[in-house]
From Swiss-Prot:
InterPro entries: Globin, Globin-like_sf, Globin/Proto, Hemoglobin_b, Hemoglobin_oxygen_transport. The modification Phosphoserine is found at S50. Heme b binds at H63, H92. It comes from Saimiri sciureus (Common squirrel monkey). GO terms for molecular function: haptoglobin binding; heme binding; hemoglobin alpha binding; metal ion binding; organic acid binding; oxygen binding; oxygen carrier activity; peroxidase activity. This is Hemoglobin subunit delta. Keywords: Heme, Iron, Metal-binding, Oxygen transport, Phosphoprotein, Transport.
Length: 146
């Protein structure tokens, strides 16, 4: 992902304020509510029958935290996202058979959650930088599919 120095600074500054536990759970939960077909990958998580059930599900929250932990690792290696996400790409492609479009959807949901959580601090410039990052991460996660 090519980010300018200002974009890298903006991403790092905002990310340093992110509560990975909360934002991860909210982002994954919203993905499952807004795009209900993604729930098929999480049938073992139990109750996903309503928005309230999804958003309150401790397994959704725990996995969201794990997902955002991996995303944080990616932020530390923006110049090598394919390498950083190679194992996760292989897992999601070969074993879990996740549609790679879901990575793009989750990235966009994450941007929405960040905007909701940071309000005016999430300026259009910050959003543009994060859109580049989530697109790069989605591409890296989809790498094994090609």
């Amino acid at each position: 992902v090519h980010l300018t120095g200002d974009e890298k600074s903006a991403v790092a500054a905002l990310w340093s304020k992110v509560n990975v536990d909360e934002v991860g759970g909210e982002a994954l939960g919203r993905l499952l509510v807004v795009y209900p077909w993604t729930q098929r990958f999480f049938e073992s998580f139990g109750a996903l029958s309503s928005a309230d059930a999804v958003m309150g599900n401790p397994k959704v929250k725990a996995h969201g935290k794990k997902v955002l932990g991996a995303f944080s690792d990616g932020l530390a290696h923006l110049d090598n996202l394919k390498g950083t996400f190679a194992q996760l790409s292989e897992l999601h492609c070969d074993k879990l058979h996740v549609d790679p479009e879901n990575f793009r959807l989750l990235g966009n949901v994450l941007v929405c959650v960040l905007a909701r959580n940071f309000g005016k601090e999430f300026t259009p410039q910050v959003q543009a930088a994060f859109q580049k990052v989530v697109a790069g991460v989605a591409t890296a996660l989809a790498h094994k599919y090609h």
